[in-house]
Amino acid sequence: MILSKKNNAVIILILLILSEVILAGTTGKISGKVTDAATGEPLPSVNIVVVGTTMGTSTDVNGNYVLLNIPAGKYTLKFSMIGYADFIVEDVRVNIDLTTKVNAYLKEEVIQGEDVVVVAERPIVRKDVSNSQMNLAGESISSLPVQNVVEVLKLQAGIESGRDGIIVRGGSANQTVFMVDGLSQNDERSNIPYATVSLSAIKEVQIQTGGFNAEYGNLRSGLINVITKEGNSSVYSGTINFHYSPPAAKHFGNSVYDPYSYFNRPYLDPDVMWTGTNNGAWDSYTQRQYPQFEGWNAVSEATLKDDDPTNDLTPSAAKRIYEWQHRRQGEITKPDFIIDVGFGGPVPFVSEYLGNLRFYTSYYQQRDMFVFPLSRDSYSETQFRTKLNADISKSLKLVVSGLYGEINSVSPYNWNVPTGSVLKTTYDVANLLNSSSGNAILYMPGYFSPSSIYRTMFAVKLTHILSPKAFYDIKLEHFTNRYSTYQMELRDTTKKYQPVPGYFTDEAPYGYWGYSVSGIDGMIMGGWMNLGRDQSVNSTTSLKFDIINQLNLSNQLKAGAEFVYNDYNINAGTYSPSMNTWTREQVYQLFPYRLSAYVQDKLEFEGFIMNLGLRAEYSDPNTEWFQLSDFDKLYSAGYGNSLEKSAAKEKVKGKLYLSPRLGVSHPITDNSKLYFNYGHFLSEPASSYRFRIQRESNGLVTYIGNPYLKLERTVAYELGYSQNLYDQFLLNIAAYYKDVLDQPGWVYYQNLNSTVQYYKATNNNYADIRGFEITLSKVWGKWVRGFINYTYDVRTSGYFGLTKYFEDPVEQRDYLRLNPYQSKPHPQPYARANLQLFTPDNFGPAISGMYPLANITLNILADWKAGAYTTFNPHNIPGVVDNVQWVDWYNIDLRFSKDFDFEDFNLQLYVDVTNVLNTKFLSQAGFSDIYDYNDYLESLNFSWEEGVEHGNDKIGDYRPDGVPYDPLEPNPNNDPEIAKRNEERKKNKSYIDMPNIKSMTFLNPRKITLGIKLDF
């Protein structure tokens, strides 16, 4: 709910008195009861120590105890009391924000020094969890055939991988918060998570897909909380992990640079290159598969007939110049690799004098080669992260964290203003080719601008333990993101190259040249290139305070507040010295802030656990904004550049929101529970929706933000059931519903004479998401572990009101004939399965003290997703929507590893294989244009078609290699011979008109990665 300004100050003051900051959970707690093993009587004043730490407590008069603020991880507890043998519990697992129950049963001491040692039982069903969440230990992640955190996340139910990051239960990437040690790693320019963490540094990952407690804000779909390792105060330890993938093509088929590829064959095939594609030996089908070319004879004749005697060329010379201008070869010759290193321990020389000062540092470097090179040949990323811990006293703990990250890639924007995204995946790059500039993209390195992102973070956290039952944290964080999308090095225009005798030229198409230049075949070699520029810097500073008080054994109160201050210094645009039409800018510097506070109460009883919270969020754009009519002339060319000076302004008022949160867990038995959660979740719109001002070089305003936007809202419900099966398996079933409101969208405005044409942001988008998930997992076992999950959801989205407003009533009436857009709900269920097969320690025969068959792991991952629906309506029949479906997608990956245990270190050798079956799935990157795409669809035989064209094809079906194109014959008279031939054609799919860019039609063939990992 949104509150009026009258109540704002009062409510904020009340919440701040009750609490001080939102602190993302990084710790858990241990509780239990200590009794006499013989009589069952509770034992008071029993000392409890977390071995190897300074943490401890004692039991109360009823034998109960609580240990708060325990960092996530595995521990050993020691219970001691005079007259009783020490009771030691090993392998106690503490998870983020959860309660671990450990009861102790002390025996009277018979033999002095005799200890009772037990291993903690891990509950299959966590009774105090009232939402869908998964806690993954670092050692569990390390055995999976994955190379980064995102690949781990997308294995979970309800999570998919999207263009900008993970999609949680249908919510876009900017609806998820990614935290490391309680520090947000979301880039607040777009709210997209920066989800890079060295796997060697991970201690635990908690994944929540709904039901977030009131302490968490600026999120609506998912919460990822990564806890990194802490250095030991007495010994050094570390991990070195190296992945290596030999150079190999990232597509099936011949190289896109091959002489017979889509872009080259018309100019290099002897059958047509001299006389032209329409006059040579090609049949009509082959002609449709390639660009038209008049032939080198015609090119030569044109040079001889013009008035320039310096460009006269023979046909052979013209062909040679083509080869010179297309000399770039982009086959992959470098390997993909990942270097992942972690190391920690006491800080040398000063550790014991500075509160056992210790450190853990990680280094991560990755390179993924592009499927073909652009202004850079790969996506590369580097990250350095360090954490210092110090025990200033028994009650004061200090943590200092720092991060430096760097991404080097290519901007995906052609004539659009860059907004921070870069190219990464094989499909992202391959999909660039299906445009009229495809050959320029392949052969001119500067078509897309090189782009880098530099990230730095510094944070300090102080924990003060007030008593065994209360503590608070103070945290200060500063996170900066610097963007650099820039102009390449200028072209050397010296005509010093002689591709044919007497014909001199420069180094084109290499180097930057801002003026129009065309190749001998018409290929762009200047002007339309390297347009994107971005020198933006945005920084986020947050101050947090959080307090936790265990009021009694059943009631834990948590409260906090947070102040977040953003500095958006946006300076992006496109630039061309020769084309003002494509010179535009997006420049602003603003300082919005938000303040939030919450109260969270956790009630824990034997058959009922409840998390009850209330969160207040105040968002202030902290700016003045323009007061203009919808069709004001200040939006038009010649006026827009003076908008800031000429337009009337007013101060934008902040808004206050209240968000209730409720989570209930009801353990039915020791082995089963029901849970339910409900909450209102809010997030700020991306900065481009709130503050963007984009103008053409002539002043025409084309986009303008709206700082009056409401926060985006999701009201979510979840009902779930968990069951322990045979003390081996956990079954979890969850159903959810998300009502999504106030998402921003762009609305178009145009005046009578079209001098005003711009887009303005408004809260006009909604969505309705509902679904269910089933997960069956086996998380422990010496021989077999694994999981299988299934997700089914239905998503509907649309717009309130109109998306276009015309001052001309005729144009407005024409537009109103269209219905407001609403997507049709077509579910795309998906499933994942993981099977881990182990051989235990000391398994098999020993050879010289070694066990060759021990510690071998085979880890198999399988994915499946139902095909998406789309529309194929070549005859524009009214009402035909989403009438065709893509084929289902599936994939299998595996890792095979062998561990060697030595006295001081562990060595693991492994091999990862992705796309084990080398399965082909048709990619839209293979279509040269919309006509090529339609030709392919026309050739398929869908279930709703009649006659000879009736069939059961889906988009993605393809003609196998080696099968020539042979279309179906019309058979109006049901001729049995024609029917027989058509049956054979349908059997081998010869009738399918395949995409023209064959090299990009099938991507991501089988890939083998070799790895070595050293733990010491």
Can you describe what each PLM-predicted range is?
Residues 23-119, 124:
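Periplasm-facing N-terminal accessory domains of Gram-negative outer-membrane beta-barrel systems
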Residues 267, 289-323, 411-448, 488-531, ...:
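Solvent-exposed loop segments that connect transmembrane elements
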Residues 293, 322-418, 423, 449-472, ...:
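Transmembrane beta-barrel wall of Gram-negative outer-membrane proteins
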Residues 527-530, 534, 542, 554-671, ...:
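Signature of Gram-negative outer-membrane beta-barrel scaffolds
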Residues 736-739, 756-869:
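Gram-negative outer-membrane beta-barrel transporters
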